[in-house]
Amino acid sequence: MIPRIIAIVLILAGLLSQSAIALDSKKIYQLNEERVFQIRVLNRETGKKSSIGSGFIVGDGRQIATNFHVIGQIILEPELFYLSYLRKDGREGELKLLALDVARDLALLGSEELLGTAAEMSELPPRGSPIYAMGNPLDLGLSIAVGTNGGILNQTDDSRILFSGSLNPGMSGGPTFNERGEVIGINVATARNSISFIVPSRFLRDLVTLSTTTSLNSKEDLRAEVTRQVLAYETSYIGQLVERQWPSLTLRKLNLPGIISPTVRCWDNSAKLATTALYKRYQIRCSNKNHIYLDSDNRFVGRLIYEYYWLESDELNAIQFHNLYEDLNKDQIESKLGRDTVSNFNCETWFVEVSSQEMKSNLCRREYVEYEGMSDVLFTAALTGHSNQGFFITVILTAVDFESTLPLIEKFLESIQWNP
């Protein structure tokens, strides 16, 4: 009887211990309200805010973590803007940029004064577990949002975890806590389609370590570091694509590369034609969502898009079909970037045999003015020699090292199979 009583007591003690560890949102807020700040980008001339976000104490107590996109304006114009924090009690101070992880949208800032003690960091809790995000939504003061760990965000790498709650603008860069009040990630509220996600804290730990060896003292240092990181990430990503085994999909008489990566989704994009149309057109569009914030002008880069078009007609004569085919095969990268941001496209054209069929290929590149070595690439290849059927492929990559894209384009062509 006594052993049974002891066992019951031990079980109850364990349950009470777990209950005591788990905190509610009110307690988590109270424990961390002095650790979470508003991060501001201020104009040096006017002293007024240009953009705001959130940040929190990490490392030795003189460092603040936030999102890269929160402070992105200083990348292009550090002479015009500077960084500042604002505490809940109204105290403020200037900050210096220490280190960046552009691909994961992280930035580490430094203060000359001791700001406080950092909260403990921990790994992500199991999927479905409650998590709590703190930040300064819409410049309305410090707030906390309750959600759950929704797992890895589809079409991204493992650096983006879905947050089921709502993160309003201004909460980006704030901490995400588990039920024990430990930091398990950083809020990101910029995702399109109103999706919020968090970046796991392990990437922040790496950034704190990196800050001891990084120097970002000039405008040139900033640009060079951003360029290096983006190109390194994209080159690795493209290399992984090339090494993968690609499944195929079928479009009329062709077998084509299908979903070449877990980061990619493919959709039917065929235009709805009138019943009186004299031709048929089929289109498949595949793209990734693994995008990277670059700066306040260029916004998001790292896009991969590939599209397939098939055109056929039994009604048009050869000349009519050729004119229609040419009109449709005029793809370009959708962009509002001006010449002060990117150069004009420089293109080369050649003919290549693909699966016993001749195709006319165009390879175009344009350079980023502010980021040396960074390019957008546009590749097209169109089937030739047929009077009533046509096919063309378009591949678009943004903010990449040009040479790294060539093996990928070559693999696309090698993977096309003609089925007469």
Task: Label each PLM-derived region with a short phrase.
Residues D24-Y29, L95, V183-L254:
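C-terminal cap/linker of serine protease catalytic domains
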Residues I52, G59-V102, R127:
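Catalytic-histidine neighborhood of serine endopeptidases
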Residues R228, C347-P420:
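Short, well-structured beta-strand
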Residues L23-D24, Q73-I75, T117-R160, N168, ...:
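Flexible, gly/ser-rich surface segments that form the specificity/activation loops bordering the active-site cleft
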Residues L23-S25, L42-G61, G93:
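A conserved glycine-rich beta-strand in the N-terminal activation segment of trypsin-fold
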Residues S215-C286, L397-P420:
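N-terminal targeting sequences that direct proteins away from the cytosol to non-cytosolic compartments
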